[in-house]
């Protein structure tokens, strides 16, 4: 008897990472941080680098042994190159990265052009850091101190790595080569769309890495200095809250710092549009510092801890909910392993909380803000305390609308990320599977504006299969 057609024609593709490997790195990260709490003689900068390395090194080793070649397509449709679209040139995602099986074939001339492209890129970034006053702030002092250690090592290792990678890349004429070709005056050979993608990828790293490293360094200092004997119930809440943020930042810093084909976590493509960049960078300093207090200030001095101070049991409930939501948020970052980065595509993640939602970090973070800020509660608190009901409704309405505006920013971020990642047929298959199996599938059936929008003309047949359930 022959088997009938499968009940679900689209399966969830495998993830670019393996969760147990990622959790191994997290366990080593936390263990290193705990050990360094007991060794105050270790400088804070050294402690920060050790904790980051404790996360990165186990992942690098385990992935090198277990996941080599994981980008080989598991489904015939995954090998179809993404069309030019917004990126500007065709990207064959099945041919990205290193060829581990073919013979090495480096070219000295190609290698030299790539080095010219590398040093040109770094010189431009150094110039930007020098002339932008924001980077002279004391916040970034740990980042500059880190570079004093990292730059000599980079100067030593990068030529050897570029020579090794050039001989093993499936597509050796990368962005570095095209930048070098442009500097050498080979305008007919330099591809402007590839130079643009190269510049955008480095802009992401140059913008986010200093900020995230500074935050990570600060969290390491706070973790090492925490005095457990002085913590009350709320103190323990914020300790675990900050521990979750520390793990999140550790994953983020490693993701931005290590972007190399050797680890298969290189950038496949970068968001090419202003409509994708603006809602992302507005959420970070210095832009949030300029706009947040003026237009999106939904918090007041009366957060959930203050408002519920007279109700300890309810305070515990809110603490558990908030920590649970932030746990999901951190879990989402851990799912990326070595591949975390805003505005870029570095491999499709389908495990961890991404097995249930395309945007678990955004959902959990935005929900946690509602529980933390309680922007609508002030009139009720003042009213039931006998302090009057009038005069508070306008403030509550304003705070609620401002938090809804922040939620809208993250909704736009989610939609533009989907648009960018849909350049990869593998992500299209994942998104269509999630449309049917994700925890938000009910919302997509009820409201078309939240439904996934795949590229037209490439997955219409699959979409019809999903709709019909055949």
Residue spans for each PLM region:
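Alpha-helical membrane-protein architecture signal
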Residues: 346-354, 363
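Membrane-anchoring alpha-helices and their flanking helix-loop junctions
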Residues: 2-343, 372-470
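Short, conserved phosphate/pyrophosphate- and ester-handling motifs at nucleotide-, phospho-/glycolipid
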Residues: 359
């Amino acid at each position: 008897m022959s088997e009938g057609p499968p009940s679900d024609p689209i399966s969830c593709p495998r993830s670019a990472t393996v969760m147990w490997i990622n959790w191994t790195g997290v366990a080593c990260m936390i263990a290193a941080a705990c050990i360094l709490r007991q060794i105050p003689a270790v400088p804070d900068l050294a402690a920060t680098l050790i904790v980051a390395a404790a996360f990165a090194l186990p992942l690098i080793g385990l992935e090198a042994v277990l996941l080599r070649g994981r980008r080989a397509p598991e489904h015939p449709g995954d090998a179809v190159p993404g069309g030019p679209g917004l990126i500007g040139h065709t990207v064959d995602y099945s041919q990205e990265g290193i060829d581990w099986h073919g013979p090495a074939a480096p070219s000295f001339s190609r290698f030299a052009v790539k080095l010219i492209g590398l040093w040109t890129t770094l010189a431009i970034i150094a110039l930007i850091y020098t002339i932008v006053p924001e980077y002279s702030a004391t916040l970034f002092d740990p980042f500059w101190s880190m570079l004093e250690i990292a730059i000599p090592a980079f100067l030593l290792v990068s030529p050897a790595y570029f020579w090794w990678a050039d001989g093993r890349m499936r597509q050796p004429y990368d962005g570095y080569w095209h930048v070098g070709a442009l500097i050498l005056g080979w305008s007919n050979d330099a591809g402007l769309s590839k130079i643009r993608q190269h510049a955008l990828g480095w802009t992401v790293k140059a913008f986010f890495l200093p900020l995230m490293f500074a935050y990570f360094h600060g969290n390491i200092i706070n973790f090492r200095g925490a005095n457990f004997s002085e913590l009350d119930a709320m103190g323990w809440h914020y300790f675990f809250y900050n521990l979750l943020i520390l793990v999140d930042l550790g994953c983020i810093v490693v993701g931005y710092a290590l972007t190399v084909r050797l680890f298969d976590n290189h950038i496949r493509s970068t968001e090419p549009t202003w409509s994708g960049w603006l809602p992302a960078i507005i959420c970070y300093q210095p832009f949030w510092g300029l706009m947040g207090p003026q237009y999106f200030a939904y918090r007041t001095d009366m957060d959930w801890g203050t408002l519920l101070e007279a109700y300890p049991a309810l305070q515990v409930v809110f603490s558990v909910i908030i920590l649970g939501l932030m746990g999901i948020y951190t879990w989402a970052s851990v799912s990326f392993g070595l591949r975390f980065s805003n505005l870029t595509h570095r491999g499709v993640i389908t495990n961890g909380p991404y097995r249930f939602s395309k945007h678990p970090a955004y959902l959990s973070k935005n929900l946690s803000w509602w529980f933390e800020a309680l922007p609508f509660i002030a009139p009720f608190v003042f009213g039931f305390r006998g302090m009057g009901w009038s005069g508070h409704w306008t403030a509550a309405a304003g705070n609620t609308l401002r938090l809804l505006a922040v939620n809208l920013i993250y909704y736009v971020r989610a939609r533009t990320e989907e648009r960018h990642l849909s350049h990869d047929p593998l992500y299209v298959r994942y998104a269509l599977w999630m449309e049917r199996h994700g925890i938000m599938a009910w919302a997509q059936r009820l409201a078309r504006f939240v439904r996934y929008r795949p590229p037209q003309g490439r997955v219409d047949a699959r979409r019809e299969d999903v709709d019909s359930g055949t």
